[in-house]
């Protein structure tokens, strides 16, 4: 897409939001409580603040304000307001390609916010526990938050990821014509690295005329030992391993597809 010569400030709002899910099997009530306590401490408000603050530092954003809160019995949230450092719009790369990895990120945000909320969850029957983190990066100006996508997913790799990207509003060029998007995009996957795409099965649901893009990601490899909390697969019978594997895989598919699946 040819670079636009705008009249005044770029008034487009670009919002990137995604949910990450971590799934675990905890055999007993004590193990379930232990997992919830572990994941709640791992992603408490202070830890989330460190992650988001480091994100701001990497992308070159100025932190204006931080609001954070831990909740009882579990969960946390952090919201950071940031502003952009001076940047020449002509120097901004608007091409579609995977965002850089953490060690190479250099970018700017403008009058923007980054927020995260966590939702640990378990049920007394079945042994399944889930952890969900909602993250949103919203910007106004020439910068797309998609540039931060690759870094954030690398930081928060999980079993399932759902991503939404939307461009709202319009901006005008020097001739007064309105533009409702200022960069080319046909899939969020264009902004992911090849190694990231190789780890997940992905599907897109896009509404191009509304500038709405959606991608769902499900981890390809399944190894039971990575889903057990304080229990080793080798300590279980073959029947138990098969039953737990089936329960975990069903849980992951239900979250991925967003609907309950009947047992076969």
From Swiss-Prot:
The record marks 111-112 as: Cleavage (non-hydrolytic). Its EC number is 4.1.1.50. Keywords: Autocatalytic cleavage, Decarboxylase, Lyase, Polyamine biosynthesis, Pyruvate, S-adenosyl-L-methionine, Schiff base, Spermidine biosynthesis, Zymogen. Binds 1 pyruvoyl group covalently per subunit. GO terms for cellular component: cytosol. Is synthesized initially as an inactive proenzyme. Formation of the active enzyme involves a self-maturation process in which the active site pyruvoyl group is generated from an internal serine residue via an autocatalytic post-translational modification. Two non-identical subunits are generated from the proenzyme in this reaction, and the pyruvate is formed at the N-terminus of the alpha chain, which is derived from the carboxyl end of the proenzyme. The active site is at residues 112, 117, 140. It is an enzyme of class 4 (lyase). Belongs to the prokaryotic AdoMetDC family. Type 2 subfamily. PANTHER family: S-ADENOSYLMETHIONINE DECARBOXYLASE PROENZYME (PTHR33866:SF1). This is S-adenosylmethionine decarboxylase proenzyme.
